[in-house]
Swiss-Prot record:
Family per similarity comment: Belongs to the IMPDH/GMPR family. GuaC type 2 subfamily.
The protein's name in its UniProt record: GMP reductase
Keyword line: NADP, Oxidoreductase
CDD domains with a match to the protein in the record: IMPDH
Residues that, per the record, bind NADP(+): 209-232
NCBIfam families for the chain: GMP_reduct_2, PRK05458.1
Alphabetized SMART domains for the sequence: IMPDH
Membrane keyword on record: no
Annotated PROSITE patterns: IMP_DH_GMP_RED
Enzyme class: oxidoreductase
Active-site residues from the entry: 180
InterPro entries attached to this UniProt entry: Aldolase_TIM, GMP_reductase, GuaC_type_2, IMP_DH/GMP_Rdtase_CS, IMP_DH_GMPRt
Protein source organism: Lactobacillus gasseri (strain ATCC 33323 / DSM 20243 / BCRC 14619 / CIP 102991 / JCM 1131 / KCTC 3163 / NCIMB 11718 / NCTC 13722 / AM63)
Keyword Transmembrane helix: no
Length: 330
């Protein structure tokens, strides 16, 4: 058993960041931008690459407005045309791939036709795998200029192996998301200790990390940054918007959007190896407003951290207050 698993496990609700002296007059002075790959984005946040969260139209809007995105991989036959469409619009292309044999043919096709996406994410539930490592090496050989993220993983060993194979970033989180039931179906995962897993992985990482799953509040973004995330992937908080692909449903006068996990029966179209579920999330209006609110809250976080940009958050002190943060808010 590895020594780091003897440390105390904690998650987002268990942590509070400790304020430092503020050095800016207004939170508007705080810079929330982050460089990821060759590009700089407004905030360190990316909607989850799930079919109920992202589609072509939203990807276009995000890219046009300075946000990072990752297109899902559930219509594989459309991906090459998606890359072409984004490039025709003068925008960056960011796609997902799996590890099936057909994906190698797809990578060969992209290389041959010189349809080169700026970003690729290898999207596998258990990313610490010989087959993911094989795919990393293949993509970096065929598409060396593409920024490659691989995941999902949960341990420092996984970070080291995927980075050593050539991954430019790794994605941390096995089953902590609201629509994921991996921890219930398999007994494995980072549900309940996602933030601690991120902390452990960050100690081994030499390249960027994406924290994926378990985000319930905007303040969790700052906590993710504190514990090593360059980007924070969010599903359920983004699924309820006008621009979200899920169907809009009204129940007793209240509006909801459909949201489902990538390994759900809805996504797979069959009851086979299901590790996700479907749910309804409250309708939240335009995603523009949510992204603006996230940026403003992150600016406030920077001001509390006593700095002018995200780097200040990475070095603040923190306290563990087991399950007591929201006692006064319930």
């Amino acid at each position: 058993m590895s020594n780091y698993f003897s440390m105390e496990a904690f998650d987002y609700d268990d942590i509070q960041l400790v304020p430092n002296k503020c050095i800016i007059k207004s939170r508007k002075e705080a810079d929330t931008s982050v460089k990821f790959g060759s590009r700089t984005f407004k905030i360190p946040v990316v909607p989850a690459n799930m079919e109920s969260v992202i589609d072509d139209d939203l990807a276009i809007w995000l890219a046009e407005n300075g946000y990072y995105y990752v297109m899902h991989r559930f219509h594989p036959e459309k991906r090459a045309n998606f890359i072409k469409m984004m490039h025709d619009k003068g925008l960056f292309a960011s796609i997902s791939v799996g590890i099936k044999d057909s994906e190698y043919d797809f990578i060969d096709y992209l290389a041959k036709e010189k349809i080169i996406p700026e970003y690729i994410t290898i999207d596998v539930a258990h990313g610490h795998s010989d087959y993911v490592i094989k795919m990393i090496k293949y993509i970096k050989d065929k598409l060396p200029d593409t920024f490659l993220t691989a995941g999902n993983i949960a341990t420092p060993e996984a970070v080291r192996e995927l980075e050593n194979a050539g991954a430019d970033a790794t994605k941390v989180g096995v089953g902590p998301g609201r629509a994921c039931i991996t921890k219930l179906k398999t007994g494995f995962g980072t549900g309940g200790w996602q933030l601690a897993a991120l902390r452990m992985c960050s100690k081994a990482a030499r390249k960027p990390l994406i924290a994926d799953g378990g985000i319930r509040h905007n303040g969790d973004i700052a906590k993710s940054v504190r514990f090593g995330a360059s980007m924070v992937m969010i599903g359920s908080l983004f699924a309820g918007h006008e621009e979200s692909p899920g169907n809009l449903i009204t129940i007793d006068g209240k509006r909801y959007k459909q949201y489902w996990g990538s390994a759900s029966e809805v996504q797979k179209g069959a009851y086979r190896n299901v590790e996700g579920k479907q749910m309804l999330v409250p309708y939240r209006g335009s995603i523009k407003d949510t992204l603006r609110e996230m940026q403003e809250d992150l600016q406030s976080s920077i001001s509390y951290a006593g700095g002018k940009d995200l780097s200040a958050i990475r070095v603040v002190d923190y306290v563990i207050v087991k399950s007591s943060i929201f006692d006064g808010d319930k």
